[in-house]
Amino acid sequence: MIPLQHGLLLAAILFVLGLTGLVIRRNLLFMLICLEIMINAAALAFVVAGSYWGQPDGQVMYILAITLAAAEASIGLALLLQLYRRRQTLNIDTVSEMRG
């Protein structure tokens, strides 16, 4: 069994990597991927904590997080596809410009 500190440290590292990618990247597709990494890091923390205390609640929350991530990914990819068809780019700087 993996110790609690190791699992939570791995989850924290994954979360920080996802957050860093979300802040640094300018492509919306990569930002969506980084958001998925952050959701998976939080789900990993739930599983590790549930395993440490011997409760199945962490695994239930993991299933809920995976369901949420799948819904978020499908809606996000559909929106990105429509955005790419209209603007021919996924760069956040060009997308955020408002028409006046």
From Swiss-Prot:
Q: What is its main location?
A: membrane
- Report the locations given in the UniProt record: Cell inner membrane
Q: Which reaction does it catalyse?
A: a quinone + NADH + 5 H(+)(in) = a quinol + NAD(+) + 4 H(+)(out)
Q: How does it sit in the membrane?
A: Multi-pass membrane protein
Gene3D superfamilies reported in the protein's UniProt record: 1.10.287.3510
One GO molecular-function entry: NADH:ubiquinone reductase (non-electrogenic) activity
Q: Name one GO cellular component term.
A: NADH dehydrogenase complex
Q: What is its EC number?
A: 7.1.1.-
Regions that span the bilayer: 4-24, 28-48, 60-80
What's the short name of a Pfam family annotated to this entry? Oxidored_q2
Biological process per Gene Ontology, one example term: ATP synthesis coupled electron transport
Q: Does the keyword Membrane apply?
A: yes
What domain of life is recorded for the organism?
Bacteria
EC top class, in one word?
translocase
| Keyword Lyase annotated | no
Question: Which keywords does the record carry?
Answer: Cell inner membrane, Cell membrane, Membrane, NAD, Quinone, Translocase, Transmembrane, Transmembrane helix, Transport, Ubiquinone
What family does this chain come from, according to its entry? Answer: Belongs to the complex I subunit 4L family.
- Self-association state and partner proteins as the record states: NDH-1 is composed of 13 different subunits. Subunits NuoA, H, J, K, L, M, N constitute the membrane sector of the complex.
Role of this protein: NDH-1 shuttles electrons from NADH, via FMN and iron-sulfur (Fe-S) centers, to quinones in the respiratory chain. The immediate electron acceptor for the enzyme in this species is believed to be ubiquinone. Couples the redox reaction to proton translocation (for every two electrons transferred, four hydrogen ions are translocated across the cytoplasmic membrane), and thus conserves the redox energy in a proton gradient.
The protein's name is NADH-quinone oxidoreductase subunit K
Q: Which organism is it from?
A: Dickeya chrysanthemi (strain Ech1591)
Identify the taxonomic lineage of the organism of origin: Bacteria, Pseudomonadati, Pseudomonadota, Gammaproteobacteria, Enterobacterales
The protein's gene is named nuoK
